[in-house]
Amino acid sequence: MSSQPNKNLKVFDNPNIERNFIIQINMPEFTCLCPKTGQPDFATLYLEYIADKVCIELKSLKMYIWSYRSKGEFHEAVTNKILDDLIQISNPRFMRLKAIFNVRGGIYTTIIAEYQQKNWTFKTKIDLQYQG
């Protein structure tokens, strides 16, 4: 597997497909570029998901996240694009991506995007707030 930034997300078989378990991934080094100024925007990404048939392979996720370092993207667009790509590759039962961007011009931005499979519900109430 390449150690260069790329968009090639990989998955592996869910080892406990019969169970709803939460996978939480903290990515504190996300960087993209402001599409207006070209200046870097820094964020911490919090991914929470309940896998269905496959789980996301972590090294490929790291390389995928690094691929945004030279891309000009608005916070809202990049958060939703990442979520869409992760959903497309893994088709999770549930997925939430929270992007907390560092201060820019005195303003902090947090974007939260979610997805849930149609006809899938968790049998008990669950709080998926990242505890990291």
From Swiss-Prot:
Q: Which residues does the entry assign to the active site, renumbered to this chain?
A: 34 (thioimide intermediate), 41 (proton donor)
Q: What class of enzyme is it?
A: oxidoreductase
> Keywords of this protein's UniProt record, alphabetized?
Cytoplasm, NADP, Oxidoreductase, Queuosine biosynthesis
Q: Hey, which pathway is this one from? A: tRNA modification; tRNA-queuosine biosynthesis
- Which Enzyme Commission number(s) are listed? 1.7.1.13
The record's Gene Ontology biological-process terms are: queuosine biosynthetic process; tRNA modification
Q: Does the keyword Ribosomal protein apply?
A: no
- Gene Ontology cellular component? cytoplasm
- Report the catalytic activity: 7-aminomethyl-7-carbaguanine + 2 NADP(+) = 7-cyano-7-deazaguanine + 2 NADPH + 3 H(+)
Check the record and name the InterPro entries matching this protein.
Answer: GTP-CH-I_C/QueF (IPR043133), NADPH_dep_7-cyano-7-deazaG_red (IPR050084), QueF (IPR029500), QueF_type1 (IPR016856)
Q: What does this protein do?
A: Catalyzes the NADPH-dependent reduction of 7-cyano-7-deazaguanine (preQ0) to 7-aminomethyl-7-deazaguanine (preQ1).
The protein depicted here goes by the name: NADPH-dependent 7-cyano-7-deazaguanine reductase
List the top taxonomic levels of the source: Bacteria, Pseudomonadati, Pseudomonadota, Gammaproteobacteria, Candidatus Pseudothioglobaceae
Q: Which gene encodes it?
A: queF
